[in-house]
Amino acid sequence: DHKRVLEGDKGANTGGMGAYSPSRLINPVLEEKILNKIIKPTINALKEMGSNYKGFLYAGLMIIDSEPYLIEYNVRMGDPECQTILPKLKTDLLEIIQACCRGKLENLEIEWYDKKSLCVVLCSKGYPERYDNEVLIENAEKFNLDENDFIYHAGTKKIGNKIYSNGGRVINFVSLSSNFKESRDKIFNHINKLDWSGGFFRKDIGYKVIDE
């Protein structure tokens, strides 16, 4: 994901201004290194400790000279990584969670859509510092989305029939496509339909994988 608030990956750190999947860095060789160097040893250590942990295990990695290094673990999904990845999931998420809880994941074939996914986060002006809440967002419910487009409310609240901002990161726009540029263009088209003077977003999410 893109952590910095400003375009070009500059400015203050945030919870995440957007993300894309798949990563430009991943390949079969690196994936094997991550599994053998980090994931499998972690799972084996949990077993040795007698831990019966079942759930998400989110590894925050840094790749240096094609070698993976573990920065942190979280027992949750990332935000906005979750919004970016889950729309690519063809298998019902509930089936996966149930199989995990019952210890039967090895019997479940998890399938994914072969598409690119891009997420752009619309934020309150001033984020990640001071910002105003309860700023009216016009047209927030007037989208005609196709099956590959998704809108996730985060820092919003509904008063009557109107939607207002209620946090720093406010709305996530996600689009699946055969290429990242098409996903980005569809997202921009949706954002431009909003009437919200109190918001901003990074226009360069995915710039490292989008060939203009």
Where are these regions (language model features)?
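Active-site "cap" helix and flanking loop/linker of ATP-utilizing ligase/carboxylase catalytic domains
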Residues: 32-57, 74-146, 159
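Short beta-strand elements
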Residues: 1-2, 59-63, 68-77, 155
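A short glycine-rich, hydrophobically flanked beta-strand micro-motif that places a catalytic Asp/Glu
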Residues: 51-65, 203
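Structured core elements
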Residues: 58-60, 69-70, 119-121, 172
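ATP-dependent carboxylate/phosphate-activation module, predominantly the ATP-grasp catalytic core
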Residues: 1-38, 75-88
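Generic C-terminus detector
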Residues: 156-160, 164-212
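Short beta-strand/turn micro-motifs at beta-sheet edges
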Residues: 6-8, 107-109, 156-163
